[in-house]
């Protein structure tokens, strides 16, 4: 490990400790975030501050979520739908969230609306040796050919939970999604119990919009 790698490892450890101090204490999630090198998922300009608790632009009007948000959503999923299992991510973006899910032991499928981001992240996953299945498409419609899923995580905001995603949940599966208006959404978890869905409401966040047939136009 060279000096740069050691420096990044220290920054990663400090990021994890900061998340713990903010109340995110699931050790499996924190361990995954300690292992996955976030600086590889941002551009060179942002890499020096990759372990600060901030979101960064990744192009095409999209962002890599701040570490707190990643840890928060991952904890909601993990505590209700522990690995191993089949998880669908909506909004591949930088690929960081999918890599965290992969590190936890899930079989990860991810849908990205923007072809350029998809192509970039597929190359990154290949270089990192990550076996994550990706496709370009309307994330609000899910990935019907691979359904059902044990878990679904939506990393963009929707005005309501897309019916297509609910239909692609397996029994006892859970879906984590920010739902609300353009400027503010409430993190919401749906769990499938037979033919009905139970709903839990959590903290408020601000995400980029989910664009698609069952999202924002």
Curated annotation (Swiss-Prot):
- Superkingdom of origin: Bacteria
User: Subcellular location, in the record's words?
Assistant: Cytoplasm
Residues in the active site? 65
> Matching InterPro entries, A to Z?
PCMT, SAM-dependent_MTases_sf
Q: Provide the GO MF annotations for this entry.
A: protein-L-isoaspartate (D-aspartate) O-methyltransferase activity
Task: Give the Enzyme Commission number.
Answer: 2.1.1.77
The similarity annotation says: Belongs to the methyltransferase superfamily. L-isoaspartyl/D-aspartyl protein methyltransferase family.
Entry function: Catalyzes the methyl esterification of L-isoaspartyl residues in peptides and proteins that result from spontaneous decomposition of normal L-aspartyl and L-asparaginyl residues. It plays a role in the repair and/or degradation of damaged proteins.
HAMAP family noted in UniProt: PIMT
| PANTHER family in the record | PROTEIN-L-ISOASPARTATE O-METHYLTRANSFERASE, PROTEIN-L-ISOASPARTATE(D-ASPARTATE) O-METHYLTRANSFERASE
Q: What is this protein called?
A: Protein-L-isoaspartate O-methyltransferase
Protein source organism:
Chlorobium limicola (strain DSM 245 / NBRC 103803 / 6330)
């Amino acid at each position: 490990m060279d000096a740069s790698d050691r420096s990044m490892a220290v920054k990663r450890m400090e990021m994890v400790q900061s998340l713990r101090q903010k109340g995110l204490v699931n050790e499996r999630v924190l361990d995954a975030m300690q292992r996955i090198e976030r600086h590889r998922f941002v551009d060179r300009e942002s890499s020096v501050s990759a372990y600060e608790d901030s979101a960064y632009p990744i192009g095409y009007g999209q962002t890599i979520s701040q570490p707190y948000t990643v840890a928060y959503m991952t904890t909601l999923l993990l505590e209700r739908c522990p690995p191993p299992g089949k998880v669908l991510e909506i909004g591949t973006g930088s690929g960081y969230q999918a890599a965290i899910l992969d590190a936890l032991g899930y079989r990860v499928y991810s849908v990205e609306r923007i072809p350029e981001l998809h192509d970039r992240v597929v190359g990154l996953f290949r270089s990192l040796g990550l076996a994550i299945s990706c496709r370009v498409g309307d994330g609000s419609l899910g990935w019907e050919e691979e359904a059902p899923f044990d878990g679904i995580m939506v990393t963009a905001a929707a005005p309501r939970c897309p019916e297509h995603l609910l239909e692609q949940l397996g029994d006892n599966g859970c879906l984590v999604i920010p739902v609300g208006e353009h400027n503010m959404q409430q993190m919401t978890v749906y769990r499938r119990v037979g033919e009905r869905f139970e709903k839990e409401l959590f903290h408020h966040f601000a995400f980029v919009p989910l664009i698609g047939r069952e999202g924002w136009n």
